[in-house]
Amino acid sequence: MQSVTSVSGGKTSAYMAIHYPTDHYVFACVLTNHEGSISKDKALIQECQNRLPHFVASHEDDLTLRRILELEQELGKQIKWVASEFALEDFVQGVTDLPGYRSGKPRLFNSLTRFCTAQQKIIPIAAYCHNFIDGAKPVLMNLGFRYDEPHRVKNWNCKNDRHRMALSCPVTGGNWKYKETEWRISDFPLYRDRIINADVRAFWQKKKWDFPEVSNCRFCPFHTDFQLQLQAQQFPENLDWWMQLEAETGHTFGKRTIADRINQPLLDIFDSPCVCTD
């Protein structure tokens, strides 16, 4: 069985990649065509386009992308970049032509319909593992759940390791056919070895590597209000994407608008953070 590490660009997954070597490393990049999200670092854009030719911009922090590139050098092994054919806003606006995905009326992702994670992360990684690593056999995948995150391990079940794979395409006018398959077997080496956040931070402080204070996509609605407020100060240009989609669709990413969450006076730092890398 081939082993795979899914790296997110955050400090925990990078720690895991270094301390628990695997046969393959993969990074799923969340794409956007939003002009305000285009990096001002032209060299970074070129590096991203070398790996993803259709790359325009990402909802990831520039520092996240740089850390992925540097981690590849640290590992001495390729980190394969994967991404959806479509930008995230294409899924929101319902303009994709992917099989099995509804088109037409726009809708926003939320805690019940997290198609952002599914379409931009899980499906590209699963497709890569299925098509280029071990075919119909599942891969052993390291996931970066730490010992101080027991709820993430306890809430995990086998359904998270299954995916509907397309078996045939309707070239002759027929319908797409699918089969649900177990594409990965998840392993939690950090949890097993009782690695906690303090261990991870101490390691990177010693190496003098810095990471984004808030991991995963900028302004992810699954971040805490406190994290959103931090990002509003750092990335006002990217914030426009989220607020504009709420205005255009007449819906919100959660119970409150992004603007309400950012402008509220109370900073609650004890909410559960985003776990999009699940």
Task: Write out the residue ranges for each language-model feature.
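Nucleotide-activated chemistry modules centered on ATP-dependent adenylation/adenylyltransferase
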Residues: M1-D278
